[in-house]
Amino acid sequence: MKIAILSRNSKLYSTRRLIEAGRTRGHTVRILDPLRCYMRIAADGFSLHYKGKPITGFDAVIPRIGASVTRYGTAVLRQFEFMGTYTPNPSDAILRSRDKLRAHQLLASQGIDMPVTVFGDNPDDTQDLLSMLGPPPHVVKLNEGAQGAGVILTEKASASRGVVEALRGLYANFIVQEFIGEAEGADLRCFVVGDRVVAAMRRQAADGDFRSNLHLGGTAAMAEASPQEQDVAVRSARALGLAVAGVDLIRSQRGPLVLEVNSTPGLEGVEGVCGVDVAGTIIQHLEQAIR
């Protein structure tokens, strides 16, 4: 099998592990920087070039597209799709996952529970908008933030109004959610490949923070996801059209709640903590998908 990995940095842990796993299983693996790909679009066919040469013959493409290059990276991935190349995470699925508002609408439509979420665009409606959510604390999130960036905890109604109105003044897109205090700054990252959870880790926020992202100083330990949590994680990935996903849940009094579905989850944390060959499992999924 000939596999392309769309990645801007071949030295990143996740990219290196996918290369290693693919080659270990006897496949040809090539790294392509999506920003150096260019394409021809016409009724008579689609084509891609890279560094002056046509890109042909790939059986599968694994997107490792960073948030900063989402628009062009997904355009390149879509070109691969139109050329008949399999991908576990299609371009439209990635776009769904990176729009928090759209993702939550899709999850809710499938009966998947999450922190209650509100969204609005009219500054005159701020107080009524927040009343739809309930009393603070509230969590304000930029709609396209990543790795914990653009996430603010407000503990008073006046603070919530102030943050919402400030973000509106900056023409920022954001959502506001209820704060789940019983989670105590912890979440559960479930790594989904295909139709199952292959690894799970519990992430704990650093002292003084409520965001559990490892990039922000959080810690992680191997965890066992309950059957209900596994079901929610798999259904969440499926609802967005993703075959490979990191689904972040919090444990609440009303059961598991989905915080986010990540379409480009890092492998270093989960492989290091859980000792699971996640990269190899992703390659096995490709093999099964294109038989």
From Swiss-Prot:
Binding-site residues for Mg(2+) 1, renumbered to this chain: 248, 260
Record-linked Pfam families: RimK, Rimk_N
Binding site for Mn(2+) 1: 248, 260
Stretch forming the signal peptide: none
PROSITE patterns reported for this sequence: ATP_GRASP (PS50975)
GO MF annotations, alphabetized: ATP binding; metal ion binding; ribosomal S6-glutamic acid ligase activity
Keywords from the UniProt entry: ATP-binding, Ligase, Magnesium, Manganese, Metal-binding, Nucleotide-binding, Protein biosynthesis
GO cellular component, one term: cytoplasm
Keyword Signal annotated: no
Enzyme Commission designation: 6.3.2.-
Domain ATP-grasp span(s) in chain numbering: 104-287
Record-listed Mg(2+) 2 binding positions: 260, 262
SUPFAM superfamilies referenced in this protein's UniProt entry, alphabetically: Glutathione synthetase ATP-binding domain-like
Annotated protein name in UniProt: Probable alpha-L-glutamate ligase
Name of the gene encoding the protein in the UniProt record: rimK
